[in-house]
From Swiss-Prot:
SMART domains: ASCH. GO terms for cellular component: cytosol. The active site is at residues 21, 24, 74. This is N(4)-acetylcytidine amidohydrolase. SUPFAM superfamilies: PUA domain-like. Catalyzes the hydrolysis of N(4)-acetylcytidine (ac4C). It catalyses: N(4)-acetylcytidine + H2O = cytidine + acetate + H(+); N(4)-acetyl-2'-deoxycytidine + H2O = 2'-deoxycytidine + acetate + H(+); N(4)-acetylcytosine + H2O = cytosine + acetate + H(+). Residues 7-93 form the ASCH domain.
Amino acid sequence: MLLNKITFFERFEHDILSGAKTITLRDEAESHVIVGQILPVSTFETERWFCDIQIIDVTPVKLTELTEVHAKQENMTLPQLRDVIAEIYPGLEQLFMIRFRILSQ
């Protein structure tokens, strides 16, 4: 079933709105989006809407395949990115990279 909204931790809001964060790494359950799809974006903590995004690409990627390029697209260093993934998805190897662009704020 396609997602009809997407949430991010509040700590990522500024990076998304500034354009510094252009991808999100999700597990399979949160990977059900299609190229061109438009989604409202809210904070995970309070479900407060803060922008809409359009999906540009969805690509499977393994945790061990993450590079500095992925980290830069997340506006983090590679060690920071791996730590965040381990915190959110402990023990998960298969991820999905969802590339997006902001449509409105």
